[in-house]
């Protein structure tokens, strides 16, 4: 090879490396938020009831059917604290199995609830996805107050035999409407 060709090859290699280096310094692409609307109807089985002074703590196992952006079932645990002034705070968390915006897998869905005389406030968070839901993140709130169905099996939105697998008669049951946004990390 002659000197002009070597210099030309080195120059091309240098420019190629410079372009690759510049591309690596660009910020990561951000996932675009996707609106999420869905509802759930659950079946709750009381595991324990404790009284600590004037406060009552109820722990329940929950199974729920989801319809909308989230389509599938959730199995988890809920802990509700009933305060002497009549307000209720609660936390629930479980594993959701199904599809989210058409993608299949599992993820963890967590809720934090506050029930006061002024109504319900619920915040939900979803993450820790597997399968096609790997990289899923989301959050939002509920729309309006939960609809309580009471003991037995809810009349609509939930089938005690098929969705989720047989759970027997519920100690309590609720239907909740959710809104928020999700994204899938690139």
Residue spans for each PLM region:
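Short intrinsically disordered, low-complexity coil segments enriched in acidic
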Residues: 1-3, 25
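Bacterial N-terminal signal peptides
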Residues: 13-25
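Beta-strand-enriched cores of mature, soluble protein domains
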Residues: 32-186
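Sec/Tat signal peptide C-region and signal peptidase I cleavage site
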Residues: 26-31
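Bacterial N-terminal signal peptides that target proteins for export
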Residues: 3-15
